[in-house]
């Protein structure tokens, strides 16, 4: 809680200096991006120490060992991590644990750290409602969480090949499809 308050105070201080107006839209955009970059750089400088097992050796620090292990794998020594990174990691851990309701699926998807989360439903609804040319075979390229493959399987597609390049996404998609009971119709493949 204190760390988040410190980060918010730093953000408020960084936001005191708005970008200067440009003489053209392109220059205004450049100044805006420059200000955003400076803000991100400053906020990224607040570092938190981690022990080998991801314990935070600070008084009253929360236990983030499980969240860190899910995101980074086994610990490999002491490290310094940006507080913003740790806060994102905690959010990803909560999403993974609780899942995100996907109305078009009628179920929850549990995104893993580093895998795009289906929080905007427009593209999911499009796949859920679009007419399908065939029920025999579909491909989900860049499957991520596997949400689109799951929707296609629930719509009656006989065989779906879901691909991704990221090992985290492949692990995430497999876990979601297994939890949803759809592994008999969806094959998850490394691209």
Where are these regions (language model features)?
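Conserved SAM/SAH cofactor-binding pocket of Class I
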Residues: 120-191
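SAM-dependent Rossmann-like transferase core, predominantly class I methyltransferases
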Residues: 65-137, 141-143, 147-148
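N-terminal auxiliary segments of SAM/dcSAM-dependent transferases
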Residues: 2-100
């Amino acid at each position: 809680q204190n760390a988040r308050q410190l980060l918010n105070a730093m953000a408020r201080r960084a936001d005191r200096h708005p970008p200067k107006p440009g003489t053209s839209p392109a220059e205004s955009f450049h100044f805006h991006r420059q200000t955003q970059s400076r803000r991100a750089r400053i906020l990224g400088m607040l570092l938190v120490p981690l022990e080998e097992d991801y314990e935070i050796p600070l008084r009253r620090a929360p236990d983030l060992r499980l969240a860190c292990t899910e995101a980074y794998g086994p610990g490999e020594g002491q490290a310094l991590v940006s507080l913003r990174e740790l806060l994102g990691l905690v959010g990803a851990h909560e999403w993974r644990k609780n899942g995100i309701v996907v109305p078009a699926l009628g179920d929850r998807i549990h995104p893993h750290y580093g895998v795009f989360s289906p929080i905007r439903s427009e593209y999911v609804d499009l796949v859920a409602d679009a007419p399908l040319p065939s029920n025999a075979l579909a491909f989900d390229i860049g499957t991520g969480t596997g949400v689109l493959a799951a929707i296609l399987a629930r719509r009656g597609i006989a065989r779906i090949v879901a691909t991704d390049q990221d090992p985290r996404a492949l692990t995430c998609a497999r876990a979601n499809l297994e939890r949803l009971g759809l592994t008999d119709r969806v094959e998850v493949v490394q691209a």
